[in-house]
Regions:
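Bacterial N-terminal signal peptides
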Residues: 11-21
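Hinge/capping helix and adjacent helix->loop/strand transition within the periplasmic-binding protein
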Residues: 62, 86-97, 105-201, 249-257
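Signal peptide-proximal N-terminal region
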Residues: 58-70
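Extracytoplasmic "Venus flytrap"
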Residues: 39-53, 76-79, 160-167
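Paired acidic/hydrophobic, glycine-rich loop segments that form the ligand-binding mouth/hinge
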Residues: 94-101, 205-211, 229-231
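Bacterial N-terminal signal peptides that target proteins for export
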Residues: 2-12
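C-terminal lobe and pocket-closing loops
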Residues: 131, 217-257
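Immediate post-signal peptide segment of exported/extracytoplasmic ligand-binding proteins
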Residues: 25-39, 65-68, 91-97, 144, ...
């Protein structure tokens, strides 16, 4: 969660709020009372970013002096780069606009990639909704139930993605290069919500998504057994899926790991 430098928000933690001088709290209450905060989401409705943002919007105003209303505004495009650029260039730095976009965009700025029009050092960072634990899941209809079977069969699976710079695209590409996975990226969807629709329509047969988003927004597909999670690509194996192999354990060389 990000916003431009400007009037600061009271932290949600009660202990922090109590430490704020009363005069400052009164000033913030006067400013935010009756106001609306715009929460810009860089991806389409129906995905994990959207769900997190709507839950935050429902509760966050109760923890800000003055109890402003939070309104979610989806602004998908280029793996949330459009929203990040808007937050930096167009949104007024007055404490009434917050952005929720892919954190990996900061690395795009560091690498000097085209399209980045913001300076990540000039955002004020409020926090993150969750630590994403990325997994690749494929359709049951492919007949693929394990990473070993997938590699041995050579079955080309189309993976739905959003755009370079996000985990939906970058992680499958890395796993293709390091593990030799036979996959083809089909990028350009506005978020994992539209990817899920494409998955159900048979346009793509797989997705790289966070485990948290799989549980929240792909619940029906998971409960019906329509998705087989084959590999996890996290900093460490996730305890909720001990049966799913961890990508570094599958790598055959130190460079791949």
């Amino acid at each position: 969660m990000y916003r431009r430098s400007g009037r600061s928000l009271v932290a949600c933690a009660i202990v922090v709020a109590l430490a704020v001088p009363l005069a400052r709290v009164a000033a913030q209450e006067s400013f935010y009372k009756g106001k609306t905060i715009r929460l810009i989401v860089g991806l389409a409705p129906g995905g994990g970013f959207d769900i997190y943002s709507r839950v935050i919007a429902r509760h966050m105003g109760k923890h800000i002096a003055g109890n402003p209303i939070l309104v979610v505004d989806n602004m998908p495009g280029a793996a949330s780069l459009l929203a990040a650029n808007f937050n930096y260039k167009a949104a007024k730095p007055d404490g009434l606009t917050i952005g929720n976009f892919v954190g990996g965009l900061v690395f795009q700025q560091m690498l000097g990639l085209p399209g980045v029009e913001f300076d990540g050092l000039k955002f004020e960072y409020l926090g993150v909704p969750a630590q994403d634990n990325f997994m690749i899941g494929v359709a049951k209809s492919t007949g693929i139930t394990s990473i070993e079977q997938w590699k041995a069969s050579g079955t080309l699976i189309k993976i739905g993605g959003v755009a370079p710079g996000g985990g939906t695209d970058d992680i499958p590409k890395i796993l293709k290069a390091t593990l030799g996975l036979p996959l083809q990226m089909v990028s350009g969807y506005k978020g994992t919500g539209p990817v899920r629709l494409a998955f159900n329509a048979g346009e793509v047969q797989g997705v790289c998504n966070s485990l948290e988003s799989f549980k929240a927004t792909w619940r029906s597909e998971m409960e019906r057994g329509e998705v087989n999670i084959l590999v996890q690509a996290n900093l460490k194996p996730h305890p909720d899926v001990p049966h799913v192999p961890w990508a570094p354990d599958l790598a055959k060389s130190d460079d791949a790991k």
